[in-house]
Every structure is written in structure tokens, then in C-alpha cells.
């Protein structure tokens, strides 16, 4: 097939101009030619190293060269004009298990943020290896629609993903809740028997052998709440042989947050697995300020054991309405309700007043349903986000009709609000927390960095204007200042054109060190 004529593209200042192509020019004769060159960019390489000016060349799915590439030509050239080229962002904590199976356009909420890889199977919830014939219990029902619980093995889920690729790369965990329901049915309000725990361990081991990266728990939620520490250790023993990760939505993120951290590290150490604490927070007003204690405890463990945590840049969480009894001092907005879908986006307090009932009764009538809970302190969010052990994860729920804005805004919010506006950390650190650090923790080779030979997962953004536009009132808003996103060398999003239909994503596998 003949090569296309070179296209040279540039950027004009401010308004939402995005990527603007000039008239195609004939390709000069060059010794080396590639598919794409991003010229005159500010390179933030994902390692935390200082930014530098230069060009990036892409050939196929890899970065072919970085530096002064004036002697090279490409089928497409983009004039960055000093705007930032960085590794594509890695969402350390997503619930995109279903979304990655629905076609490339389903991932606009992530590609429009510059996200090129998502980690699925979090909080103990994964679409495999347990099919379900009826609606799963909360919070599983808010993650994936009932008709998608059809995969009886991780291999089946992986094959579906390979057959119908997403716009983004996917790294997958196996969820404890899913395993528990597979082994125990709906009788999960008790500890598993030894036989049931062994069945879960074997299923986890099989999934890890088929390419899953680790094991996640959601010990806060009813399907797993009754599981004692010993049960989790027994199941997680499969991680030892396969060198998988232990990732957890801890048993408690409020009054018992310190005890939950201790339990988490006990589990990880017992099976020799690196530990990732999901969406670390100190929830509920009486715990505001306790992040100083929780971070100090994590630091003590991290001095001798691999432990990290992810965080999202908001003071509100989002989960099932049944997760905690509602409180007058914690405002709640409904994200979805099965019996009352018309209430999505409404305040629980207003619904209760309209119905003439208290908050608890309103939540009961809305269930199954979900909500946004304004239960954190800004000072804690900043302290956790700025901590060197943190990385960024959205925890976004793509199915809710009125989702938490983190689904659409997490990564631009870190760049625009917390880095540029508040100066919580510099741009290099912000990018590192969303790229190189995350790739290293999850064991994803050749991603998360700008380096010759690395995969061409890239984002081009304007550091002066990038910001989140998604709000609690209008959560489905595309970010500003993310100009283009590439996955494995293919463009999957442009600010001017939106999401492409390019199925550029791949299923990724963890490459773990021999020892913890």
C-alpha cells in the first residue's frame, strides 16, 4: 500500500481550536520515515524528571525516537508549539469492566482525559469468573448491567476483549465478591467454609494463570463484609505462586481506618503480595484530619514492604446508597435508582422532604441505587494526593446516569486545579503520579514513560488551560485542554473531533519481580 502524503498540523492559541490541519504538503525525501512526529513539544516523560523541549516520533505502536528530529519525516506531523507531550495516563482504579467491552466510543469519558490504560476488577468486583443469572447484589449491580455477567472464566473475558478491543488498554484484577458469590451463592453473610475458600483460591489461581494481574477485595461491602481476615488470606494464597497484587477497598475508611490498614498489610505480608490501598481517604466528619495518622502508619509499613495507594482529587465519594446509613451532616446526591430513575441527580434530603420521610427511609425506597457522598475534608485530600506513595485513580462508575464527576474529570483536575492553580506539586510530579509511578507499581512494562522503544501511549495537552469541566451538577462534561490522545500509536481522541472508533487498546499483563 502506498504511503500517504505527509500532513503537517499545528495549534493556534487559546480558544478550543484543538488540532487544526493545514494543507497537506508533499513529503520530502528522508532517510528514515515514521508514521507520526510530534514537533516542538514540551516533553514530560513520566519519570518525574524535569521537562525538556523536543520532538517525538512514532512508528507502528512504539516510540521510534525522541529529541531533535528535524531530519526525519512522517505521514503525519503535529506542531505542538510548546504544548505538553506526556505518556498516556493510567487510571489506577476504574470500574470500566463492562465499558471496555462496549466499543471504542464507550471510553470517551477516559480518552478525553488523556487516559490510555485502565485497571478494572477493583473493590472486589469483576465480571469474571462467575456468571450470574439474576441481578447481582449492591454494589455489584452499579458496576455492570445484569446481562454482562456471563463470563465463567477470566479466559472468556479476555477473549471477548481481544475479539472486540476497546479504545484503551486494560489490566484486570479478580474480585473477591465475585468469587464469594460463585462459591457461596447469595449466602454471603457468614464466613466461607474451608471448602468454599479453597474453591475461591483455585478459581483465583486459574484466573491469574490466564492473565489476571491480581486479587481485589471490597471488605466494606455486604457480599464480603462477613469474610474474616483468615478467609481472605486463604483465598489470596494464590497470589504467591503467580506474584499477583493485593488491591483492596479496605474494611473501613472511617472510624476504623487505622485498624483496616493493619489488616490490609497483614493480608499482603501473609501471602507475599505487594499491597495497593484503593482510594485512600478518611471519611465522615469525625475523621477529618486523620490522614496525618493514616499516612504515617502506611509509611511505617512501606519502609519494609511494597505498599502504595491511589486517590481521586475530590472531597466526595460515591457508592451504593445502602453502604452506610445516611446522615444529615453528609449531603448525598443520587447517581442512580432502579425503582426511581427519575431521581438521578437529586439531593437525598430533597427527596426525603418531598416524600415526607426521613433520610434512611428515602434511601431504602431508592434502592437499589447509588449516591455521591460529601464526606471528606479538602485538607485530607491534598495531604493524601501530595504524598509520594500516591498515584491517581478515578474510581468512576460509567453506568450511572448522573455519575460522580471523577468519571470525566479526575486527571485534568489533578493537572489544572491541584498542580497549576494550587501548586500542590509541579507538573512533572503530577504526570509521574498518573503514568510512570502507576506503571511501575502494577508491573506494566514499556508504558507510562516517554522513551525510545516504549509503547506509543501518548497525550498532548495545554498545561496553561487544561482543567476539568465535569461538576457535581453537570458531571458528563469533556475536559478542556486535552488536545489529542494516542493508544499504541493510534489516535483515539481529539479535542476537535471527539472519540474515534479505533479499537487501539490491548489486554495487558503484569510483569512482576521474582521477590517482593
Tell where the protein language model's regions lie, with residue ranges.
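Glycine-rich tight-turn/loop motif centered on a GG-T
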Residues: 138-150, 186-194, 224-225, 247-248, ...
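Short, ordered loop/turn segments at secondary-structure junctions
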Residues: 123-124, 220, 250-252, 280, ...
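Divalent metal-binding pocket/active-site signature
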Residues: 206-264
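Alpha-helical scaffold segments that flank or form the walls of functional sites
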Residues: 99-173, 192-210, 233-241
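Active-site neighborhoods of metal-dependent hydrolases
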Residues: 158-161, 167-194, 198-221, 269, ...
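Short acidic, glycine/serine/threonine-rich loops at helix termini
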Residues: 128-135, 181-187, 229, 258-262, ...
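Active-site microenvironment of metallo-dependent hydrolases
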Residues: 3, 7, 12-54, 59-62, ...
Amino acid at each position: 500500500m502506498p504511503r500517504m502524503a505527509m500532513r503537517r498540523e499545528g495549534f493556534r492559541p487559546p480558544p478550543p481550536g484543538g488540532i487544526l490541519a493545514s494543507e497537506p504538503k508533499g513529503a520530502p525525501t528522508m532517510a528514515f520515515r515514521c508514521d507520526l512526529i510530534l514537533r516542538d513539544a514540551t516533553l514530560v516523560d513520566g519519570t518525574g524528571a524535569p521537562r525538556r523541549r523536543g520532538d517525538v516520533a512514532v512508528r507502528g505502536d512504539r516510540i521510534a525516537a525522541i529529541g531533535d528530529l528535524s531530519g526525519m519525516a512522517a505521514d503525519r506531523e503535529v506542531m505542538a508549539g510548546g504544548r505538553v507531550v506526556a505518556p498516556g495516563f493510567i487510571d489506577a482504579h476504574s470500574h470500566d469492566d463492562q465499558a471496555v467491552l462496549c466499543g471504542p466510543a464507550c471510553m470517551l469519558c477516559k480518552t478525553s482525559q488523556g487516559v490510555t490504560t485502565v485497571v478494572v476488577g477493583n473493590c472486589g468486583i469483576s465480571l469474571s469468573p462467575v456468571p450470574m443469572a439474576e441481578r447481582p447484589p449492591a454494589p455489584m449491580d452499579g458496576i455492570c448491567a445484569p446481562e454482562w455477567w456471563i463470563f465463567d472464566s477470566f479466559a472468556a473475558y479476555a477473549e471477548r476483549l481481544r475479539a472486540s478491543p476497546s479504545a484503551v488498554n486494560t489490566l484486570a484484577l479478580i474480585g473477591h465478591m465475585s468469587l464469594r458469590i460463585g462459591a457461596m451463592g447469595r449466602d454471603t453473610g457468614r464466613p466461607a467454609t474451608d471448602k468454599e475458600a479453597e474453591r475461591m483460591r483455585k478459581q483465583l489461581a486459574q484466573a491469574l494463570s490466564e492473565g489476571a494481574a491480581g486479587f481485589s477485595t471490597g471488605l466494606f461491602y455486604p457480599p464480603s463484609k462477613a469474610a474474616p481476615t483468615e478467609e481472605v488470606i486463604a483465598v489470596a494464597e494464590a497470589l504467591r505462586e503467580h506474584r499477583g497484587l493485593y488491591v483492596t477497598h479496605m474494611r473501613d475508611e472511617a472510624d476504623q481506618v487505622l485498624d483496616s490498614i493493619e489488616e490490609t498489610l497483614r493480608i499482603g505480608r501473609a501471602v507475599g503480595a505487594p499491597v495497593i490501598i484503593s482510594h485512600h481517604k478518611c471519611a465522615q466528619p469525625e475523621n477529618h484530619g486523620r490522614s496525618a495518622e493514616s499516612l504515617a502508619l502506611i509509611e511505617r509499613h512501606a519502609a519494609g514492604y511494597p505498599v502504595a495507594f491511589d486517590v481521586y482529587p475530590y472531597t466526595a465519594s460515591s457508592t451504593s446508597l445502602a453502604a452506610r446509613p445516611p446522615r444529615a451532616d453528609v449531603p448525598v446526591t443520587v447517581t442512580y435508582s432502579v425503582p426511581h430513575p427519575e431521581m438521578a441527580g437529586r439531593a437525598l434530603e430533597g427527596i426525603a422532604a418531598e416524600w415526607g420521610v426521613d433520610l434512611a427511609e428515602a434511601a431504602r425506597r431508592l434502592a437499589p441505587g447509588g449516591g455521591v457522598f460529601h464526606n471528606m475534608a479538602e485538607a485530607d485530600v491534598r495531604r493524601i494526593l501530595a504524598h509520594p506513595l500516591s498515584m491517581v485513580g478515578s474510581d468512576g462508575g460509567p453506568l450511572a446516569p448522573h455519575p460522580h464527576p471523577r468519571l470525566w474529570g479526575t486527571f485534568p483536575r489533578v493537572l489544572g486545579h491541584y498542580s497549576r492553580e494550587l501548586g500542590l506539586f509541579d507538573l512533572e510530579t503530577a504526570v509521574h503520579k498518573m503514568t510512570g509511578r502507576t506503571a511501575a507499581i502494577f508491573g506494566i512494562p514499556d508504558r507510562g514513560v516517554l522513551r525510545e522503544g516504549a509503547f506509543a501511549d501518548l497525550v498532548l495537552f495545554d498545561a496553561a488551560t487544561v482543567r476539568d469541566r465535569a461538576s457535581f451538577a453537570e458531571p458528563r462534561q469533556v475536559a478542556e485542554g486535552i488536545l489529542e490522545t494516542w493508544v499504541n500509536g493510534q489516535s483515539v481522541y481529539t479535542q476537535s473531533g471527539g472519540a474515534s472508533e479505533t479499537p487501539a487498546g490491548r489486554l495487558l499483563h503484569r510483569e512482576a519481580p521474582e521477590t517482593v
